[in-house]
């Protein structure tokens, strides 16, 4: 097969590992910078061009769309879909998961546990919003933030009001979430492919920081997840319509809570922490789906 890897960063560990996984299974892997693609949108033969040439002959793509280019990246993925190319994560699912508020609403609809979350537009709604999520301490998040950036822990009601007013004054979209103190600055990252959790790790934030993101200096360690956590992770991915995703879970006194579903999860941290390849299952899943697509038969993922 000919598999395109949509990534702005060919030198990244994640990109290199995906290329290696494709090639080790006998496939041709082509890294395509998403932002350098341009599209011919028509009703007869939609196409994508890249560096002056039309992209043809692709059986599948693996989107690694950076959050900062979600709109254009989803347009490129959608164009590949219109050309009949299988996408490991389709454009609609990526867009769903990137809209943090919409993602939480979808999880809520499916009855999947998550931290109590509040969202408002007007400053005079702030006091009631704070009470709604259980009062201080509480977490304030920018909807557009990624990798722990734009996430603030407000220890008191006064601090929360000040931060919220400042964000709203900048016309920023924010949401409030209850603070799960018992998680102690840690979470569980589950790497899901299809209907399986192929690897999982516990992430612990640096001392004094409640955020567990590895990009912010957190560390990872192997962890054994419970059957309930495994089931919740897969259910959360399905709620988004994704195939490949990272699911972040908080362990709380009332059970596991889904924090986020990431459509382009980091690969380096979880592979180096667990010693498990997460890229091979991705390619294996693509093989199964493309074969089924070509033979026009249903697949049991």
Curated annotation (Swiss-Prot):
Record-level GO cellular component terms: cytoplasm
UniProt key word Protein biosynthesis: yes
Gene3D superfamilies from the UniProt entry: 3.40.50.20, ATP-grasp fold, A domain (3.30.1490.20), ATP-grasp fold, B domain (3.30.470.20)
Binding residue positions for ATP: 141, 178-179, 187, 211-213
Residues reported in the UniProt entry to bind Mn(2+) 1: 248, 260
Annotated binding of Mn(2+) 2, by residue: 260, 262
GO BP terms in the entry: protein modification process; SOS response; translation
Binding site for Mg(2+) 2: 260, 262
Residue ranges of every copy of the ATP-grasp domain listed in the record: 104-287
EC number: 6.3.2.-
UniProt KW keywords: ATP-binding, Ligase, Magnesium, Manganese, Metal-binding, Nucleotide-binding, Protein biosynthesis
Cofactor binding annotation: Binds 2 magnesium or manganese ions per subunit.
HAMAP family: RimK (MF_01552)
UniProt family annotation: Belongs to the RimK family.
Protein name: Probable alpha-L-glutamate ligase 1
């Amino acid at each position: 097969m000919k598999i395109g890897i949509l990534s702005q960063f060919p030198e990244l560990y994640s990109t290199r590992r995906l290329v290696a996984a494709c090639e080790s299974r006998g496939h041709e892997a082509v890294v395509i910078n998403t932002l350098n693609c341009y599209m011919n949108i028509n009703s007869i033969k939609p196409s994508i061009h890249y560096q002056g040439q039309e992209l043809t002959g692709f059986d599948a793509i693996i989107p690694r769309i950076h959050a900062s280019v979600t709109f254009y990246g989803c347009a490129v993925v959608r164009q590949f879909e219109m050309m009949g190319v299988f996408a490991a994560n389709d454009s609609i699912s990526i867009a769903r998961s990137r809209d943090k508020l919409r993602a939480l609403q979808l999880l809520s609809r499916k009855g999947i546990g998550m931290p109590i979350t509040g969202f408002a537009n007007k400053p005079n709604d702030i006091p009631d919003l704070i009470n709604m999520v259980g009062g201080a301490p509480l977490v304030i998040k920018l909807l557009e933030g990624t990798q722990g950036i734009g996430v603030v822990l407000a220890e008191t009601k006064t601090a929360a009001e000040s931060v919220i007013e400042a964000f709203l004054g900048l016309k920023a979209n924010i949401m409030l979430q209850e603070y799960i103190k018992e998680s102690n600055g840690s979470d569980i990252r589950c790497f899901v492919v299809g209907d399986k959790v192929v690897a999982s790790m516990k992430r612990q934030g640096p001392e004094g920081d409640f955020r567990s993101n590895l990009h912010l200096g957190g560390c990872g360690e192997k962890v054994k997840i419970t059957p309930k956590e495994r089931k919740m992770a897969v259910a959360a991915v399905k709620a988004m319509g994704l195939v490949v995703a990272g699911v972040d879970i908080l362990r709380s006194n009332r059970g596991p809570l889904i924090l986020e579903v990431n459509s382009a999860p980091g690969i380096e941290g979880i592979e180096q922490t667990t010693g498990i390849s997460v890229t091979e299952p991705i390619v294996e899943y693509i093989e199964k789906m493309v074969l089924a697509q070509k033979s026009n038969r249903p697949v049991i993922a």
